[in-house]
Every structure is written in C-alpha cells, then in structure tokens.
Amino acid sequence: HLNNYLQNQGYENTILYDPSGYDVNALTTVSDLKSVSTHLLEKQWFRDIVSKSNYTATLPDGSTQTWRNTNTFLDHTSEYYNENVKGIKTGSLSNDYNLVVLYQQHGKEFLICSLGSQSDSSRYDDVNYILKTIEITYNSI
C-alpha cells in the first residue's frame, strides 16, 4: 500500500519496505527527494518543525513528545552551525550518510541533496563545500 501511494503521488523511483524508510533495501532518487521536499516546503508547519534543533509536539491525549533534530547545522553548539540552514533531513543506511538541507541566502532558497557521504562529519563537510561555492559565486557577481 505504501509504495502504491508513493507512485500515485508521483514518486515513481522510491520503494520503501516500512514507513520509517530505514531498510537497506529502500530506494529513492535525488529527483524524488527534491519533489517531496519541495511539496512539503509549501507547508509552513513543516518549515517550522524542520528548522528547529528540538521540536515538542502536543499529542491528542494532551501529553507532549520532544524530538531532537540530528541536523547539526541547526545546533548552536556545533562547529557546523549555520544560521542560514533551515532543515531538512539527515539519513543514513549502512555506510552512506545523507543530508537534505534548505539554505536561505541572498534572497533565495537553495535545496541541497547530498547523498553517499562516507561519515557523519563528511556529510556536513560536503554540504559546507556547496554552501561556500554559493557564497563565492554570489560574491563574485
């Protein structure tokens, strides 16, 4: 049912085996990640949640649940902290470390998908390289 739903939504190159997506056989593409991210970024509630280092939700029974975002670009105490990064998602399976970020700078938004980094820290180094390239490009104009 889940994969039928994904295909009906236009995510034709994504196959999941459980709702978490945490299965070494799960597949997706940068194109599908871009599509789902772009769709979700249309929702302000999504932007609010993914841009925070911690998020507390009130559950239907009135209790609360707090989640810690593992994207260290959002962590004020991290060497990788960047106030212009506004989310979105970390992920890792086996030895592949992935990161999808929304970067806001120069009055524009940049959606960056970095897949297959070799370590947790290298995913941030890889994206930082892209962010610095954006800065160099805009500063040379």
Please state what every model-predicted region is.
Residues 1-141:
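Penicillin-recognizing serine hydrolase domain
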